[in-house]
Amino acid sequence: MSKIVLDNVRKSYGGNIEVIKGVSLEIADGEFVVLVGPSGCGKSTLLRMIAGLESITSGTISIGERVVNNVEPAERDIAMVFQNYALYPHMTVRENLAYGLKNRKTPKEEIERRIAKAAKVLEIEQFLERKPRQLSGGQRQRVAMGRAIVREPAAFLFDEPLSNLDAKLRVQMRVEIKRLQRSLGTTSVYVTHDQMEAMTMADRLVVLNAGHIEQVGTPIELYEKPASIFVATFIGSPSMNLLQSPESAAWQPGRAITLPSGGYTFGVRPEDIRILEEGDQDADGFNAQVRIEAVELVGAESYIHAALSDGKPLIFRVAGRSTHNIDEMVRVGASATDVHIFGADGRRVSD
């Protein structure tokens, strides 16, 4: 196991197109860090730079105590798991697992020991003599992970490994990957655009936006205290409701809210909004009169899509099956502890 340190890492193409803009990050020994962000934010490029598949323009990357800027990928003591399984179709599972080790002149007895250990951990012992075409998508992904595990590397790098799987299998595999990483204790960097994967798997999240880091923290820290409007809207589904200043007759901040001078954006998550029944006091964080436009039942809860009196959208969640009707007018509110205030620059105003 090894820590990974990025110090002011930059990547430019053609000398003037900068895609990674001074990223500094320390990943602790044994930590599972997820790089997350929209398409084009630089997360896969950054992972490939750690792996040595992309050169860096400036800065340093260290794995363990060694600066690896000019070290070949094969010498960095890392193992990658890709979106595409990249298995040799003419080889058995056993041969696929052994291939890289044979190229490194690993003794035969050691190869067999590592294969047996990985196969047991991944529960693929019964598939060792099969070829990839005889396996399901989930089984192939386990083999791809096994090929990384037998390397016994200092770090695992995962590049959107679940993207080709169906929704049910993705849930199963993300649990398995996290369980496996915890049992092995291997430093891991995982790239995804799927916030559900990011939130459920990460020890820490790194949210990237246009080549720079927006925020680093645990999933709950980013969810409860987003550092910017970008993070607030990217983390969480449905997305956080955002209302621009100045407030109007359509909505009002509560009596317990202190607003910054100048422009601001007021945020509240769908699950923090409640319907105020007749006779309720106004909520101390946020109040609005809304018209219900649509109701989505998603099993144990319903999402209500509504409109403020000025036409701006608002979405909120209620438990179970909603009994409210389309075009019904309701008053909603939120507590002061559940609202988020962002300044004119889009950054969070200190609580």
From Swiss-Prot:
Recorded topology in the membrane: Peripheral membrane protein
Q: Which UniProt keywords apply?
A: ATP-binding, Cell inner membrane, Cell membrane, Membrane, Nucleotide-binding, Sugar transport, Translocase, Transport
Any one GO MF annotation of this record: ABC-type glycerol-3-phosphate transporter activity
Might you give the EC number(s) for this enzyme?
7.6.2.10
Domain (ABC transporter) spans: 4-235
Instruction: List ligand-binding residues for ATP.
Output: 37-44
Q: Which domain of life is it from?
A: Bacteria
EC top class, in one word?
translocase
Any one Pfam family match given in the protein's UniProt record, by short name: TOBE_2
What does the UniProt entry say about where the protein is found? Cell inner membrane
Q: Which reaction does it catalyse?
A: sn-glycerol 3-phosphate(out) + ATP + H2O = sn-glycerol 3-phosphate(in) + ADP + phosphate + H(+)
GO CC term, one of those recorded: ATP-binding cassette (ABC) transporter complex, substrate-binding subunit-containing
Concerning Gene3D superfamilies, the annotation shows: Nucleic acid-binding proteins (2.40.50.140), P-loop containing nucleotide triphosphate hydrolases (3.40.50.300)
Biological processes annotated in GO: carbohydrate transport; glycerophosphodiester transmembrane transport
The record's note on quaternary structure and interaction partners says:
The complex is composed of two ATP-binding proteins (UgpC), two transmembrane proteins (UgpA and UgpE) and a solute-binding protein (UgpB).
Relate the protein's function as given in its record.
Answer: Part of the ABC transporter complex UgpBAEC involved in sn-glycerol-3-phosphate (G3P) import. Responsible for energy coupling to the transport system.
The entry assigns this protein to a family as follows: Belongs to the ABC transporter superfamily. sn-glycerol-3-phosphate importer (TC 3.A.1.1.3) family.
Q: Write the protein's name.
A: sn-glycerol-3-phosphate import ATP-binding protein UgpC
